[in-house]
Amino acid sequence: MRVLQLPALRDNYIYLLHNPDTATAAVVDPAVAEPVLEKLAELGAELVAIFNTHHHHDHVGGNRQLLERYPRARVYGSQVDRGRIPGQTVELKAGETVEFAGRLAKVLFVPGHTRGHIAYYFSESGDLFCGDTLFAGGCGRLFEGTPEQMVGSLDQLRQLPEATRVWCAHEYTLNNLRFALTVDGDNPDLQARYQQVAALRQTGSPTVPSTIGEERRTNPFLRWDQPALQAATGLQDPVRVFARLRGMKDQF
């Protein structure tokens, strides 16, 4: 299974999963259809599945147009998002699996950004498609969920193997790390990562994927139990530390 990263809109990433052996493909969070259709034509591949992480338009906006071209493609999403994902045919629950290219992805229920957010974790290849729950250096805003839910979701993700590749849905990394430095500025891993990311963005290069290990070391929203973040917020309870950090980032 090859993962192809397709930039879209201002800062979205769409992920096309390609199986060259069968000339089939699946797409994760198609914000728009055009780049997906172009890449499918280039590859000579048929779209067989659409994996949506949540219902926001910049993650499902291409569903209908893709289904017009590939009407047999199955559309996966959370059962909580029933009626909110265009063309949805499969309603998923936590712990279920989906298959592509002979590999199984476990469905992780990770609410907080939205109440029905899910992630797809391919353990064999070590690939996590986490939508807007976990970002490189940050996390999603709480539009529908609670801090308690988001901490539970992020804790679930930070326990995945350190080498797991984090394919998040937006190129927000540089700004996320600028904020991180305001609350964890003495962290040498964070300082080094910021320099690397700044250099990548100067050339227009993507900073995604990261890894779970990198996020654990440098992402303040996975470090609520670290003394530096507790000191920055003046709090110790994990949920309260997270909520304070999220509020600070919202105003950054």
Curated annotation (Swiss-Prot):
Its EC number is 3.1.2.6. Pathway: Secondary metabolite metabolism; methylglyoxal degradation; (R)-lactate from methylglyoxal: step 2/2. One of its GO terms (biological process) is methylglyoxal catabolic process to D-lactate via S-lactoyl-glutathione. The keyword Hydrolase applies. It catalyses: an S-(2-hydroxyacyl)glutathione + H2O = a 2-hydroxy carboxylate + glutathione + H(+). GO terms for molecular function: hydroxyacylglutathione hydrolase activity; metal ion binding. Keywords: Hydrolase, Metal-binding, Zinc. Zn(2+) 2 binds at D58, H59, D132, H170. Zn(2+) 1 binds at H54, H56, H113, D132. Binds 2 Zn(2+) ions per subunit. The keyword Metal-binding applies. Its cofactor is Zn(2+). CDD domains: hydroxyacylglutathione_hydrolase_MBL-fold. Monomer. Thiolesterase that catalyzes the hydrolysis of S-D-lactoyl-glutathione to form glutathione and D-lactic acid. Belongs to the metallo-beta-lactamase superfamily. Glyoxalase II family. This is Hydroxyacylglutathione hydrolase. It comes from Synechococcus sp. (strain JA-2-3B'a(2-13)) (Cyanobacteria bacterium Yellowstone B-Prime).
